[in-house]
């Protein structure tokens, strides 16, 4: 795997300055804490989420502090309605309400944000590996149309990772851990604040051989921000992030291999030294202007990214995305109004080479790709009576994708295609008491195809060309639910039903080539998203989530009413935390009673499974903690994820095994 650490020298210098600056100032502070941040940002996020008439969740750093945080799965496992299954390393399948259901690589159907600014590329695809959850103060999950405040009109909604500031995370914080498969991880962060200026920065490094052959990973990351109070009414914050991620790809296995020898790698993946290596640098700004009854936020970003991705060929892309956004929030009496817009414009130099054991061979393809996605959104909230809010809003989005082929060893064509859609939303929020809410909404979503869907290699002989009849995926979703607290119980339950037209579905053509995409006619996604926490005593807490997912075709000409593959109908997770912050242990369970289908023909279903784990932590000294994370205690062999095919058979290499037994332990400290 290649290394680019030499480009990180300026970032190391900046982080060192940040680490040194607060040390002496913090020595005068008698209070010490082990958590990364103060809860102020998280509390504010929870207050905003509580005003949303639909499924939302805020996950604080404390909720996953004892875990070995490798991917988003480690942070959002107990967020209701979020389906996450690890494949290897930081690669996970992430889906909400069946979003991007058959996309087994990169990501589709969700808007990913960091500090409120999308990290999705201009064609709306993205790499979730660029979100490093170990840096975050908290994560905000807005499911479905409830993500309107972020300008998202996708089926799945939005996930926003929020980093600390110098005011919420003063001092120096250290975290280090080691574990199975030669895993080593470390984090150092520092924050400092003055009267009108604050700064925060962090560096993380990670290395592991992986729990499968040919699954080594290496990463080096930096995050930082500087905030300025320009006046009593105007503040601005500048953000910078750098990612150097090197990940070998072990590939998918046959059913028999996944259930008997899950450690092995796919033969083609190993022979081709398949990898996904990402270098990215992101700069962004957010400026806030207080106008009295209204608040205006505006800003922009630039993201430079390099992708080196040997698979069936070596994909070598260099892209630059720029964008801007603005949002106005107004509140006066019983009326609240949000108006906003954003635009993302990107260009990429996309090349492909013959894969010679993971190295570039002869050039086979060279194209210039351009894309733009823009949206305007608005939402009005009216309280006709004290405990009832009525909400109406909508998102208008348009975009285009364009490709110009400079060279191709096989037939390939230029092309350009555009899309637009309006997605309205209507909802209500009723609060029968101060601690109970009942909500309902009805909304439309629209998802535009990305480059992988717009330009496909099809036919015999294969031709890479514009698929002019590819359509946006559209859906109407009805949702009703409740959240609240009563006695020892805190609950969050939502029922949803989405009727889709043109769902973008994919099927694997072979083990190394990314899937082909087609628009289904009519499909149905319906289910239950439930979370129930029981605070039995100060030293005893039970966390539970349950998801019921019924995804199927509707009178399809080829597949009838078959179930859609990949996501199981039932999934239950539970964690029982016993003890206090001084000493605690938390056994956990992930249970899938019956696995999902692996194909659209519904010929093959994977077996169910139950995975047991445990985490624990203790306070060693003031400001110094130790923690341990044990996964898959029994060494269960099971299938965790699938790359869907039209009709599976015994030779289909489409299965990813669950994580093997692993143990890690670490320490964290604040000075």
Predicted region positions:
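Short acidic/polar hinge/loop motifs at secondary-structure boundaries
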Residues: 110, 117-143
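Transmembrane beta-barrel wall of Gram-negative outer-membrane proteins
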Residues: 171, 178-207, 212-250, 274-291, ...
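N-terminal periplasmic "start-of-domain" segments of outer-membrane beta-barrel proteins
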Residues: 31-67, 92-93, 110
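C-terminal beta-signal and adjacent terminal beta-strands/loops
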Residues: 38, 446, 501, 591-598, ...
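Signature of Gram-negative outer-membrane beta-barrel scaffolds
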Residues: 338-433, 448, 558
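Membrane-embedded beta-barrel scaffold of Gram-negative outer-membrane proteins
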Residues: 197, 296-308, 431, 437-443, ...
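Gram-negative outer-membrane beta-barrel transporters
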Residues: 385-390, 398-399, 496-499, 518-600, ...
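Extracytoplasmic beta-strand/coil segments of soluble accessory domains associated
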Residues: 73-117
């Amino acid at each position: 795997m290649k290394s680019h650490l030499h480009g990180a020298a300026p970032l190391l210098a900046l982080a060192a300055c940040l680490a040194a600056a607060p040390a002496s100032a913090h020595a005068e502070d008698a209070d010490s804490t082990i958590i990364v941040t103060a809860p102020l940002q998280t509390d504010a996020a929870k207050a905003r989420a509580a005003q949303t008439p639909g499924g939302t969740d805020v996950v604080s750093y404390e909720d996953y502090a004892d875990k070995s945080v490798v991917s988003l799965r480690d942070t959002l496992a107990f967020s209701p309605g979020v389906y996450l299954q690890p494949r290897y390393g930081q690669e996970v399948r992430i889906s909400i309400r069946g979003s991007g259901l058959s996309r087994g690589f990169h990501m589709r159907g969700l808007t990913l944000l960091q500090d409120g600014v999308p990290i999705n590329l201009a064609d709306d695809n993205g790499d979730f590996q660029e979100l490093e959850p170990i840096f975050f103060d908290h994560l905000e999950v807005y499911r479905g149309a409830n993500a309107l405040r972020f300008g998202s009109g996708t089926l799945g909604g939005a996930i926003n990772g929020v980093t600390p500031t110098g005011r919420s995370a003063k001092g120096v914080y250290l975290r280090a851990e080691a574990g199975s498969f030669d895993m080593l991880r470390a984090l150092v962060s520092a924050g400092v604040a003055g009267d009108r200026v604050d700064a925060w920065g962090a560096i993380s490094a990670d290395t592991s051989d992986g729990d499968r052959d040919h699954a080594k990973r290496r990463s080096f990351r930096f995050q930082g921000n500087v905030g300025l109070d320009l006046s009593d009414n105007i503040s601005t914050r500048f953000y910078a992030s750098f990612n150097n991620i090197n990940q070998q790809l072990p590939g998918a296995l046959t059913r028999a291999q996944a259930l008997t020898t899950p450690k092995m790698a796919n033969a083609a993946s190993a022979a081709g030294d398949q990898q996904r290596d990402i270098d990215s640098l992101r700069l962004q700004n957010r400026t806030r202007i207080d106008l009295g009854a209204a608040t205006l936020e505006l800003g922009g970003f630039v993201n430079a990214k390099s992708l080196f991705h040997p698979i069936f060929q070596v994909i070598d892309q260099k892209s630059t995305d720029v964008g801007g956004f603005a949002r106005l929030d107004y509140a006066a009496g019983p009326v609240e109004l949000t108006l906003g817009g954003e635009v993302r414009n990107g260009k990429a130099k996309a090349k492909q080479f013959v894969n010679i054991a993971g190295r570039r061979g002869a050039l086979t393809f060279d194209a210039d790709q351009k894309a733009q996605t823009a949206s305007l959104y608005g939402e009005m909230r009216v309280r006709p009576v004290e405990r009832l809010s009525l909400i109406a809003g909508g998102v208008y989005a348009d975009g285009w994708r364009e490709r110009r082929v400079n060279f191709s060893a096989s037939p390939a064509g230029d092309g350009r295609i555009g899309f637009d859609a309006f997605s309205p939303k209507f909802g209500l929020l009723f609060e029968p008491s101060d601690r109970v809410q009942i909500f309902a909404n009805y909304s439309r979503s629209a998802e535009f195809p990305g480059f992988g869907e717009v330009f496909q290699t099809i036919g015999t002989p294969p031709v890479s060309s514009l698929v002019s009849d590819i359509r946006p995926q559209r859906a109407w979703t009805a949702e009703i639910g409740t959240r609240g607290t009563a006695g020892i119980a805190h609950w969050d339950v939502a029922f949803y039903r989405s009727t889709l037209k043109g769902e973008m579905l994919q099927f694997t053509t072979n083990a190394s080539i990314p899937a082909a995409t087609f628009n289904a006619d009519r499909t149905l996604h319906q289910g239950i998203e439930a979370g129930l926490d029981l605070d039995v005593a100060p030293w005893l807490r039970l966390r539970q989530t349950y998801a019921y997912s019924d995804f199927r075709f509707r009178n399809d000409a080829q597949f009838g009413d078959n179930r859609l593959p990949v996501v199981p109908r039932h999934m239950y997770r539970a964690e029982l935390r016993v003890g206090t912050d001084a000493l605690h242990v938390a056994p956990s369970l992930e249970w899938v009673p019956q696995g999902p289908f692996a194909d659209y023909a519904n010929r093959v279903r994977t077996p169910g499974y139950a995975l047991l784990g445990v985490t624990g932590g203790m306070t060693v000294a003031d400001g110094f903690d130790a923690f341990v994370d044990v996964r898959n205690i029994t060494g269960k062999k099971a299938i965790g994820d699938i790359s869907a095919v039209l009709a599976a058979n015994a030779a289909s290499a489409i299965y990813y095994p669950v994580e093997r037994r692993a143990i890690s332990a670490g320490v964290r400290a604040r000075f």
